[in-house]
Amino acid sequence: MAIKKSIRLECGECKEINYLTFKNAKKHPEKLELNKYCKRCRSAKPHKETKKK
């Protein structure tokens, strides 16, 4: 059974947490980085994975 890890995606520029998602930590152990829309910056910026507390 796959172990899903809850993660937050944080804007690389303004450091605001905009997205919550899950990932399979066993298949993808590396940190996730996606180009997503940031409400505060009002443009698409790279969002990096942070741990959910």
Swiss-Prot record:
GO BP annotation list: translation
UniProt key word Ribonucleoprotein: yes
Q: Which GO terms fall under molecular function for this chain's record?
A: structural constituent of ribosome
Question: Organism's domain of life?
Answer: Bacteria
GO CC terms, sorted: cytoplasm; ribonucleoprotein complex; ribosome
This protein's record includes keyword Ribonucleoprotein: yes
Q: State a single Pfam family of this protein.
A: Ribosomal_L33
Q: Which InterPro entries match?
A: Ribosomal_bL33 (IPR001705), Ribosomal_bL33_CS (IPR018264), Ribosomal_bL33_sf (IPR038584), Ribosomal_zn-bd (IPR011332)
Q: Which UniProt keywords apply?
A: Ribonucleoprotein, Ribosomal protein
Regarding protein family, the annotation reads: Belongs to the bacterial ribosomal protein bL33 family.
Any idea what this protein is called? Large ribosomal subunit protein bL33
